[in-house]
Amino acid sequence: MAIGFDEHQPLHTFQEVVGLKQPLFAQKLILCFAFHSVFICSFLNLRSSSINILSLENFRFSTIHYFSSMIITKTPFRISFVGGGSDLESFFSKKKGAVLSTTIDKYMYISTHEFFERDKIRCKYSQTETVNNVDELQHPILRTVLKDFDVKGIEVSSIADIPGGTGMGSSSSFTVGLLHNINAYTDHEVTKESLGAGACRVEIDLLGEPIGKQDQYAAAYGGLNIIEFHPDGSVQVEPVDISQETRAELNANLKLYYIGNQRSASKILAEQKKNTSQEDKFKALEKMVDLVYDLKEVLVKGDLDAFGDLLHQNWLLKQSLAKGITTPRINDLYAAATQAGARGGKLLGAGGGGFMLFYVDADKHSDVDAAMAELDATPFEFKMETEGSKIIHVES
């Protein structure tokens, strides 16, 4: 990109020349000056202190060329084993909630790059939007985050390994990855805690989504964790330390199947939130929280037969929380898998569709695969991951 200027026009600082309100991450300029017909070029960093071009009395400013940075973040999706629903404020404001979850090696990738048209914003996801004003963006998370950071002249793109609405916390992985990226783009340092809290602020406080807090913290921290939600609103993340043998068994024997029927979690969660005031629903959530600590114990011991049983108990409780969590097809799939040898399982996410997870002993894999194939459920390979959201590329 090149911007031409009248060589006789008075100029002040480089920031004023480019019209930037804040420094960009690792932004560099090549500045070319004419001095008695000889061009002198030098590299300067925009983040350095302002320089008054007028003090260079014998020089004439010619052209600025942008060599801007590209930043890419990689943020994992999550699988929640037990406790889902207790991360809603309607529950944890009255009694501590908890979930036990892991992130997996499927990711949301967010890239940012300076946009050619400095007075516009371009966002590419399942659609492409190019707007003059951030308020014109249709994507609510992009609109909220970019407005919050007051950035313009930026191009944001997203690519995901898994589609949204499938029960793996894709919206929160998007939000965490976007916050991580834009903080880097604007030269702000972040922690895992600030990413989790920031994503909750965007999705729950600013956008008013009727969702819980587990997905945001899972994506930010990564790994196998108990995530606790306290009545004062604070969140605590406790890693679950398991042996390499247990981790290998989980990676080998956790079976994931895509059953289709992508859905919006918001409707089901809104009903679940409303139902929390009912005594039987509240007690079901209390039992699910208890299962979190039971599951931690069996994982630490390496008792994975009991792990499957606890998944089954959690699924029975979860179905009672709201209509729409399960469907006749989901019930048929669950019955087919358990009859073929699965020790236990669950539907991922709020309910209605997406992915089903089962724990299956090695000698029963082919039987369960065959049973699920008969009902048009597609196996999906994955492994547990440990890193959480991270920056994987910076190009100056």
Question: Where on the chain are the PLM-derived regions?
Answer:
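Short, often N-terminal, low-complexity regions
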Residues: 3, 10, 18, 22-24, ...
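C-terminal nucleotide
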Residues: 70-80, 87-90, 99-101, 105-150, ...
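N-terminal basic, low-structured, amphipathic or hydrophobic segments
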Residues: 4, 38, 46-51, 61
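Short, Lys/Arg-enriched N-terminal segments with co-localized hydrophobic residues
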Residues: 52-69
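DPxDG-like acidic metal-binding loop motif
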Residues: 168-192, 220
